[in-house]
Amino acid sequence: MTLKELSQLYYLNREIEEDQRRLDELKSQSRSISAQKITGMPRGGTIAGSAIDRYIAEIVDLEAIISAKITQCLHERSRLERYIAGIPDSLTRQIFTLRFINGLSWLQVALHIGGNTADSVRMTCYRYIDRENKKERA
């Protein structure tokens, strides 16, 4: 498995967070349109109605996208966990889990494990990936 493949869960989670922020923003904007003050002045209902309809459609679409990404995230996590479970060395498994499943930085991984630097855990990871990729090519 490549570093790019291992990092997909992290980036997928970031996409979901960004989509969730956008969804919250859309919901807030749609509430502000529907909560406009009634002044008694004649107004055309189609403009506000169509704006609300657009927001609702966009919200529904974005919720479906988020749901699909969450499902994809669960599959990706399962795939990573199976790969990591196949790593024979316990320390390397811990490094991979903390980095690629939990999404910690190299420094956070080193601090969590203890007795290692960010560079040492990073190099342990990269060396393992290089070894495995060389085995696959051979």
Per-segment meaning from a language model:
Residues 1-83, 134-138:
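N-terminal interaction/assembly modules
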Residues 125, 129:
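DNA major-groove recognition helix of helix-turn-helix
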Residues 103-105, 116:
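Residue-level signal for the short linker/turn that defines the boundary of a DNA-recognition helix
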